[in-house]
Amino acid sequence: GPIKKNDQKLHLLFIGAIDSRKGIFDVLECFAKNKEMLQNKIIYHIGGTGDTKTMNEFIQQHQLSSFIKYHGWVDNERKEKLFRTADIFVHPSIFESFGISILEAMSYQLPIIATPVGGITDLVENNVNGILIEPGNKKQLYEAILFLIDHPEYLSEMGHQSGKKAEKFYPPAIEKQLDHL
Protein backbone atom coordinates (compact mmCIF):
# COMPACT_ATOMS: atom_id res chain seq x y z
CA GLY A 1 0.00 0.00 0.00
CA PRO A 2 0.96 3.65 -0.09
CA ILE A 3 3.67 4.93 2.22
CA LYS A 4 2.05 7.38 4.60
CA LYS A 5 3.67 10.77 4.84
CA ASN A 6 2.95 13.29 7.54
CA ASP A 7 4.14 16.42 5.78
CA GLN A 8 0.58 17.40 4.76
CA LYS A 9 1.75 17.87 1.19
CA LEU A 10 0.46 16.34 -1.98
CA HIS A 11 3.18 14.25 -3.62
CA LEU A 12 3.01 14.36 -7.41
CA LEU A 13 5.04 12.01 -9.56
CA PHE A 14 6.34 11.97 -13.11
CA ILE A 15 8.27 8.98 -14.41
CA GLY A 16 9.32 8.98 -18.04
CA ALA A 17 11.48 10.66 -20.62
CA ILE A 18 12.35 14.25 -19.84
CA ASP A 19 11.18 15.46 -23.20
CA SER A 20 8.80 18.24 -24.21
CA ARG A 21 6.46 15.70 -25.83
CA LYS A 22 5.80 14.17 -22.42
CA GLY A 23 4.53 17.49 -21.14
CA ILE A 24 7.05 17.78 -18.34
CA PHE A 25 8.12 21.29 -19.33
CA ASP A 26 4.45 22.32 -19.30
CA VAL A 27 4.30 21.12 -15.71
CA LEU A 28 7.41 23.08 -14.76
CA GLU A 29 6.12 26.23 -16.46
CA CYS A 30 2.79 25.81 -14.69
CA PHE A 31 4.63 25.51 -11.35
CA ALA A 32 6.82 28.55 -12.05
CA LYS A 33 3.77 30.64 -12.86
CA ASN A 34 1.86 29.48 -9.76
CA LYS A 35 4.80 29.08 -7.40
CA GLU A 36 3.36 31.17 -4.55
CA MET A 37 0.26 29.04 -4.45
CA LEU A 38 1.90 25.64 -4.88
CA GLN A 39 5.31 25.65 -3.23
CA ASN A 40 4.08 24.85 0.28
CA LYS A 41 1.39 22.42 -0.81
CA ILE A 42 3.07 19.97 -3.16
CA ILE A 43 6.25 18.05 -3.80
CA TYR A 44 6.90 17.05 -7.39
CA HIS A 45 9.03 13.95 -7.89
CA ILE A 46 10.64 13.39 -11.28
CA GLY A 47 12.26 10.13 -12.35
CA GLY A 48 13.82 9.60 -15.75
CA THR A 49 16.48 10.80 -18.11
CA GLY A 50 16.55 12.99 -21.18
CA ASP A 51 16.90 16.73 -21.47
CA THR A 52 17.97 17.19 -17.87
CA LYS A 53 20.09 20.23 -18.72
CA THR A 54 17.08 22.29 -19.82
CA MET A 55 15.06 20.98 -16.89
CA ASN A 56 17.68 21.78 -14.26
CA GLU A 57 18.31 25.23 -15.71
CA PHE A 58 14.59 25.98 -15.61
CA ILE A 59 14.27 24.75 -12.01
CA GLN A 60 17.20 26.94 -10.92
CA GLN A 61 16.14 29.96 -12.92
CA HIS A 62 12.64 29.91 -11.40
CA GLN A 63 13.79 28.76 -7.95
CA LEU A 64 11.60 25.69 -7.86
CA SER A 65 14.04 23.36 -6.11
CA SER A 66 12.29 23.68 -2.74
CA PHE A 67 9.40 21.56 -4.01
CA ILE A 68 10.83 19.64 -6.95
CA LYS A 69 12.91 16.52 -6.37
CA TYR A 70 14.75 15.05 -9.32
CA HIS A 71 15.69 11.41 -8.76
CA GLY A 72 17.59 10.77 -11.98
CA TRP A 73 17.13 7.45 -13.72
CA VAL A 74 15.21 5.13 -11.42
CA ASP A 75 15.63 1.36 -11.25
CA ASN A 76 12.65 -0.86 -10.45
CA GLU A 77 13.14 -0.79 -6.70
CA ARG A 78 13.41 3.00 -6.59
CA LYS A 79 10.51 3.34 -8.99
CA GLU A 80 8.30 1.16 -6.80
CA LYS A 81 9.11 3.33 -3.79
CA LEU A 82 8.19 6.47 -5.75
CA PHE A 83 4.91 4.92 -6.89
CA ARG A 84 4.12 4.02 -3.29
CA THR A 85 5.04 7.48 -1.99
CA ALA A 86 3.08 9.39 -4.60
CA ASP A 87 -0.47 10.67 -4.27
CA ILE A 88 -0.98 11.52 -7.95
CA PHE A 89 0.75 10.58 -11.20
CA VAL A 90 1.06 13.60 -13.50
CA HIS A 91 1.78 12.81 -17.13
CA PRO A 92 0.30 15.47 -19.44
CA SER A 93 1.75 14.22 -22.74
CA ILE A 94 1.54 16.20 -25.92
CA PHE A 95 2.13 12.98 -27.83
CA GLU A 96 1.84 9.44 -26.53
CA SER A 97 1.46 6.03 -28.11
CA PHE A 98 0.16 3.84 -25.30
CA GLY A 99 1.18 5.24 -21.93
CA ILE A 100 2.84 2.29 -20.22
CA SER A 101 4.03 4.42 -17.29
CA ILE A 102 0.44 5.56 -16.73
CA LEU A 103 -0.73 1.95 -16.64
CA GLU A 104 2.04 1.14 -14.20
CA ALA A 105 1.00 4.05 -11.96
CA MET A 106 -2.61 2.82 -12.13
CA SER A 107 -1.52 -0.60 -10.92
CA TYR A 108 -0.30 1.19 -7.76
CA GLN A 109 -3.77 2.71 -7.39
CA LEU A 110 -2.74 6.25 -8.25
CA PRO A 111 -5.09 8.89 -9.63
CA ILE A 112 -3.78 10.22 -12.94
CA ILE A 113 -3.62 13.70 -14.41
CA ALA A 114 -3.09 13.20 -18.13
CA THR A 115 -4.17 14.21 -21.62
CA PRO A 116 -6.56 12.36 -23.96
CA VAL A 117 -3.90 11.48 -26.55
CA GLY A 118 -3.05 8.11 -28.09
CA GLY A 119 -3.87 5.11 -25.94
CA ILE A 120 -4.35 7.19 -22.81
CA THR A 121 -8.08 7.48 -23.55
CA ASP A 122 -8.33 3.73 -22.91
CA LEU A 123 -6.67 4.16 -19.52
CA VAL A 124 -7.89 7.37 -17.96
CA GLU A 125 -11.54 8.29 -17.69
CA ASN A 126 -12.10 11.91 -16.75
CA ASN A 127 -13.28 12.37 -13.13
CA VAL A 128 -13.33 8.60 -12.62
CA ASN A 129 -9.70 7.57 -12.12
CA GLY A 130 -8.14 10.94 -12.78
CA ILE A 131 -8.48 14.22 -14.59
CA LEU A 132 -7.93 14.69 -18.31
CA ILE A 133 -6.70 18.05 -19.57
CA GLU A 134 -6.03 19.47 -23.03
CA PRO A 135 -2.45 18.86 -24.21
CA GLY A 136 -0.33 21.92 -23.47
CA ASN A 137 -3.06 23.62 -21.44
CA LYS A 138 -1.19 24.83 -18.36
CA LYS A 139 -4.24 26.58 -16.90
CA GLN A 140 -6.22 23.31 -16.88
CA LEU A 141 -3.21 21.52 -15.42
CA TYR A 142 -3.04 24.04 -12.58
CA GLU A 143 -6.79 23.78 -11.98
CA ALA A 144 -6.62 19.97 -11.86
CA ILE A 145 -3.82 20.04 -9.28
CA LEU A 146 -5.59 22.74 -7.27
CA PHE A 147 -8.81 20.73 -7.30
CA LEU A 148 -7.05 17.69 -5.83
CA ILE A 149 -5.22 19.82 -3.24
CA ASP A 150 -8.59 21.21 -2.15
CA HIS A 151 -10.44 17.88 -2.37
CA PRO A 152 -8.06 15.18 -1.14
CA GLU A 153 -11.09 12.98 -0.39
CA TYR A 154 -11.30 12.24 -4.13
CA LEU A 155 -7.81 10.76 -4.22
CA SER A 156 -8.57 7.37 -2.70
CA GLU A 157 -11.67 6.75 -4.81
CA MET A 158 -9.91 7.79 -8.02
CA GLY A 159 -6.95 5.64 -7.02
CA HIS A 160 -9.23 2.69 -6.35
CA GLN A 161 -10.77 3.12 -9.83
CA SER A 162 -7.27 3.25 -11.34
CA GLY A 163 -6.45 -0.07 -9.71
CA LYS A 164 -9.65 -1.63 -11.02
CA LYS A 165 -9.02 -0.36 -14.55
CA ALA A 166 -5.40 -1.54 -14.49
CA GLU A 167 -6.55 -5.09 -13.77
CA LYS A 168 -8.26 -5.23 -17.16
CA PHE A 169 -4.93 -4.67 -18.88
CA TYR A 170 -2.77 -6.95 -16.79
CA PRO A 171 -2.89 -10.68 -17.37
CA PRO A 172 -3.51 -12.56 -14.09
CA ALA A 173 0.12 -13.71 -13.90
CA ILE A 174 1.42 -10.16 -13.73
CA GLU A 175 -1.34 -9.19 -11.34
CA LYS A 176 -0.20 -11.91 -8.95
CA GLN A 177 3.35 -10.57 -9.08
CA LEU A 178 2.07 -7.06 -8.40
CA ASP A 179 0.17 -8.34 -5.38
CA HIS A 180 3.37 -9.71 -3.91
CA LEU A 181 5.38 -6.51 -4.33
What are these regions (language model features)?
Residues 126-127, 131-138, 147-152:
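Conserved acidic donor-binding segment of nucleotide-sugar-dependent glycosyltransferases
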Residues 15, 43-56, 72:
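Glycosyltransferase donor-sugar binding loop
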Residues 4-22, 28-31, 45:
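Conserved donor-binding/catalytic core segment of Leloir-type glycosyltransferases
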Residues 111-114, 124:
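Short hydrophobic beta-strand element within catalytic cores of glycosyltransferases
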Residues 140, 147, 154-168:
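A short, well-ordered alpha-helix in the C-terminal region of glycosyltransferases
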Residues 56-74:
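Nucleotide-activated donor-binding/catalytic signature segment of Leloir-type glycosyltransferases, i.e.
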Residues 94:
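Aromatic "clamp/platform" in nucleotide-sugar-dependent glycosyltransferases that forms part
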Residues 73-74, 81-86:
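Short alpha-helical donor nucleotide-sugar binding micro-motif in glycosyltransferases
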